[in-house]
């Protein structure tokens, strides 16, 4: 029988107490579905489905490793994925994706999450390239730091912070989604797998020196996401920077357009030496919440000039 990698579960499929509506996302590590529970509430379900290791036989829902060697790696990754779901289920914070259930089925594992409506920061960046206000950046990232602080309090790391994993709800509040810790663990321990971090947003220690991972690793990714919010594209990848650092500092690129404080903070977060970065999310959050340092927008500056002229003329 023919096989296809990453064959999605069919629409309408009954998965435990959930009914699959449709596939809504996925990558090399997993698939994500919109589903409904028995109360007809929408949920998102992430299925552990690493395309490098497994195939789903056409017409079947079961997941099978593509070789005996891959089966051992797949089983180890499944354990990492399941443990990540268990850990995330302990976190109930408005700025962190809520994991409500996790279970085994179809010879793999699933993570059930609250379904959020809105768009990613990446979509916002693409729609407003070069025109994103500092007030928006500070508000979104300061709130996200609340969520990241909670994650770090639980002795967890995100390890895949980037604009496409920062979701902005319809009410404007942000939420951290799609944790990368299980992917990172698997790719570090199984060298035959392609790296599962995101170039440009991954810290240098994610490429090497895994023993040096810490809160500062996520802080590098926050800095890269801040940089991308201004530039519209990610900074130079950290492994390339280690060989030949061509990254133009934020303080050079956007001086005069954004506050010096914000630009200096971005550059500090993107230090290759992890000891030179902010060491805690709290210290970074304090800076982001300091709106007194914010540079007035061009619109507000023009408005103040017009008001001044009006007073002089009339």
Question: Where in this protein do the model-derived segments appear?
Answer:
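Conserved activation segment of eukaryotic-like protein kinases, specifically the C-terminal portion
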Residues: 191-205
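Activation-segment/catalytic-loop signature of the eukaryotic protein kinase fold
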Residues: 102
């Amino acid at each position: 029988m023919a096989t296809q990698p990453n064959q999605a579960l069919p629409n309408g499929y009954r998965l435990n107490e959930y009914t699959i509506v449709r596939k809504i996302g996925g990558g090399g590590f997993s698939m994500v579905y919109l589903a409904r529970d028995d109360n007809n509430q929408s949920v998102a379900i992430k299925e552990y489905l690493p395309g490098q290791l497994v195939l789903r036989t056409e017409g079947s829902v079961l997941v099978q490793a593509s070789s005996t060697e891959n089966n051992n790696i797949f089983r180890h990754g499944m354990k990492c994925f399941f443990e990540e779901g268990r850990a995330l289920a302990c976190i109930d914070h408005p700025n962190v994706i809520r994991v409500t259930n996790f279970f085994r089925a179809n010879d793999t594992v699933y993570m059930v999450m609250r379904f959020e409506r809105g768009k990613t920061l990446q979509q916002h960046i693409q729609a407003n390239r070069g025109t994103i206000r500092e007030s928006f950046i500070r508000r979104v990232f300061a709130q996200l730091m609340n969520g990241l602080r909670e994650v770090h309090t639980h002795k967890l790391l995100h390890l895949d912070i980037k604009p496409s994993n920062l979701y902005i709800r319809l009410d404007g509040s942000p939420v951290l989604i799609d944790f990368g810790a299980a992917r990172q663990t698997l790719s570090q321990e199984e060298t035959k797998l392609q790296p599962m971090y995101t170039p440009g947003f991954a810290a240098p220690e994610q490429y090497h020196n895994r023993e040096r991972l810490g809160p500062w690793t996520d802080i590098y990714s926050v800095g890269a996401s801040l940089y991308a919010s201004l530039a519209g594209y990610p900074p130079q990848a950290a492994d390339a920077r280690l060989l030949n650092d061509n990254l133009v500092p934020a303080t050079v690129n956007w001086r005069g357009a954004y506050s010096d404080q914000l630009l200096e903070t971005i550059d500090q977060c993107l230090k290759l030496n992890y000891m030179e970065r902010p060491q805690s999310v709290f210290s970074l959050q304090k800076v982001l919440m300091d709106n007194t340092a914010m540079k007035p927008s061009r619109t507000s500056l023009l408005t103040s000039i017009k008001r001044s002229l009006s007073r002089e003329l009339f």
